[in-house]
Regions:
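Short hinge/gating elements
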Residues: 1-3, 203-204, 220
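Alpha-helix N-cap/helix-start and coil->helix boundary motif
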Residues: 111-112, 136, 225
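Alpha-helix N-cap recognition
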Residues: 84, 162-166, 224
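RNase H-like nuclease fold core
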Residues: 3-11, 16-108, 112, 116, ...
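Extended amphipathic alpha-helical interaction segments
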Residues: 119-213
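Conserved small/polar residues in nucleotide/adenosyl-binding loops
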Residues: 217-226
Length: 226
């Protein structure tokens, strides 16, 4: 605090502040939620945390819901001890116990065990792999000079009018880019979790594709950490 704002804060003041804030945080964490959400995004960000005198990197998962009227709401923050179906089942049950009866679409990157947990807790919910993460994961293994062209080509997949057209474009692009030693296997292997995207119209796709709200939440969280 002194380095950032020029204000010296004593340990007693920190204790007094946290004693006041922690009950409010716990109340917020337990608050009732909407009965139904159109989309819930689950994404991770990482913080350096001091644990037993050692600085370790911890994952914090953010669940952000989009209501049936299009409003965005943070459902909760969850510290990730381990990714597993059991871990995600406990989180989804916690969300369910806070009043959420139905989620139409759950959108996330390939978090281990999440899809299985969704099937157990919300069996009618559709799981959708995050398109933005798919794009980023593909581009990170490509040379800088090829990234712009590949990013443009990938639009032929996720902007296709139908699932069939998107898949056909994917196969054609795989053939094209394999000659440059660029693999699109990640898209092919995950197609089952990508194809729900094509069931929806442009406006819904735009919401599913965009991660600005989640990214903004990550940014603000890291600003607080700093």
């Amino acid at each position: 605090m002194q380095e950032l704002y020029g204000v010296k804060v004593s340990p007693d003041m920190v204790t007094a502040i946290t004693d006041k804030i922690i009950p409010e945080i716990r109340e917020w964490q337990k608050r009732q939620l909407e009965e139904q959400y159109a989309i819930v995004f689950v994404d991770a960000t990482y913080f350096n945390v001091k644990q037993d005198g050692i600085v370790v990197k911890k994952a914090v998962y953010i669940a952000l819901g989009v209501t049936m009227t299009g409003e965005k709401e943070i459902l909760g923050f969850y510290i990730g001890e381990s990714e597993s179906a059991k871990y995600w089942t406990s989180i989804l049950n916690e969300i369910k116990n806070r009043g959420v009866k139905d989620i139409l679409i759950m959108c996330s990157d390939g978090l281990k065990g999440l899809k299985e947990a969704i099937g157990a807790v919300y069996p009618m919910t559709e799981f959708q792999r995050c398109i933005v993460h798919m794009i980023r994961n593909t581009l990170q293994y490509v040379s800088y000079k090829d990234r712009k062209e590949l990013a443009q080509d990938l639009k032929q997949i996720y902007q296709a009018a139908t699932e069939e057209a998107g898949y056909n474009n994917l196969i054609e692009l795989e053939e094209k880019w394999s000659k440059r030693r660029v693999s699109l296997d990640n898209w092919i292997n995950n197609w089952e979790n990508i194809q729900p995207f094509f069931k929806y119209g442009p406006e819904t796709r735009k919401i599913m594709y965009t991660t600005n709200a989640v990214s903004y939440t990550h940014l603000r969280a890291h600003e607080t950490e700093a």
